[in-house]
Amino acid sequence: AFLSAAVSNATNPNAVNEKVFSAELGYGYRSSWLNVNLNAYYTRWMDKTMTKGGDILDENSNPVDRYSINMQGVDARHMGVELDFVAEPTRWLTINGMLSVGDWQWDSNATGYYYNGQGQPLADLKGTIASDIYAPDHAKSEVQLKGVKVGDSAQLTGALGATVKFLDGFRAGLDYNFYANNYADFALNGSSLVVGGVKTFKDPWKIPSGGQFDFNASYRFKIGSCKATLYGNINNVFNQEYIVNATDADGTWQNAYGVFLSLIHISEPTRLAL
């Protein structure tokens, strides 16, 4: 693995292959009007490599370069259950839904070594170059992640929707999507890192839950001998605003940054399929 493929051919001499173990168990039910699937999963990633970065500042606190901390031996454990169903109680009504409940967390601590923007080993966060990669003066930190929730993805999601068929060729549907148990991704910065020391993370900021309604409609018809379908979609019908992901370093919303909000509804252009 190259340390900085854009500017250097230096490779990570301690890089190892990532390993994945996964197991699933599922059950399905089928009837004339109802289909249900239930699934349980367990996945473990081992020896992941992760990189976080920040600015190297001069004496006036102006950025002069970028540093990265290359962490090895990072494990993660994802487990949960998933349920989905499709019901058609009448020929003109279809109801569908899903529920996913997960428990995802980092499962190990990691040691990270520092490099500058050119992939050179750093002796400190002031930009001093170390004598060699993994030399005694090569700056490193231990990052304690074990038990910290994995961020940037909701661990509890649900959806419920209904589609109505009416007249001849018309179809309209409304779906609600719900997101919860979403955590901000952990962050490293120069003020919180101690070269040669330990950086301990607690549970990151838990992002408030959110959801939105989406509307869709279609009409099937013929143009001569050709079959055509006219589609239309309106996402986030009621202009709900909620946080999708964020980054923080201390587990509080006050210091969260990189926050991304769901936007006001987007109406997709009408499409004609022939």
Where in the sequence are the language-model features?
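Solvent-exposed loop segments that connect transmembrane elements
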Residues: 1-12, 50-70, 107-146, 184-203, ...
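Membrane-embedded beta-barrel scaffold of Gram-negative outer-membrane proteins
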Residues: 14-69, 77-79, 105, 230
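Residues on the lipid-exposed face of transmembrane beta-strands in outer-membrane beta-barrel proteins
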Residues: 25-29, 81-87, 97, 160-164, ...
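Gram-negative outer-membrane beta-barrel transporters
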Residues: 42-44, 64-188
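Residues that define the transmembrane beta-barrel architecture of outer-membrane proteins
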Residues: 19-23, 30-32, 75-79, 154-158, ...
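C-terminal beta-signal and adjacent terminal beta-strands/loops
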Residues: 177-191, 219-263, 267, 271
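Repeated loop/turn-to-beta-strand initiation elements of outer-membrane beta-barrel proteins
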Residues: 33-36, 92-95, 168-172, 223-228
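Structural signature of outer-membrane beta-barrel domains
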Residues: 1, 32-34, 43-47, 102-106, ...
